[in-house]
């Protein structure tokens, strides 16, 4: 399991967007990854990878997905670990 080492707001530097509703009020962020249709989710206590579903209550109607981005979700996780933003629990 991966957990954040920094405040969740720092994930905005990597393109994460604050979740909507109660999730956003609790400082949760997400990033949709077109390659592989995954959604990266970070809260103050955990980091998770989910399948990207359009009806997910955490995601805005206009998602923050960069379709021209050639990275996979694993590439992004590797970059977050390398940037010292995530650690293993």
Question: Could you say what each language-model-derived stretch is?
Answer:
Residues 2-20:
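Amphipathic alpha-helical segments
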Residues 76-85:
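Short A/G/S/P-biased low-complexity tracts
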Residues 10-12, 81, 89:
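Short polybasic/polar patches that bind polyanions
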Residues 19-77:
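Acidic, low-complexity, intrinsically disordered interaction modules
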Residues 1, 85-89:
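Short intrinsically disordered terminal tails
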Residues 15-16, 28, 85-86:
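Short glycine-aromatic motifs
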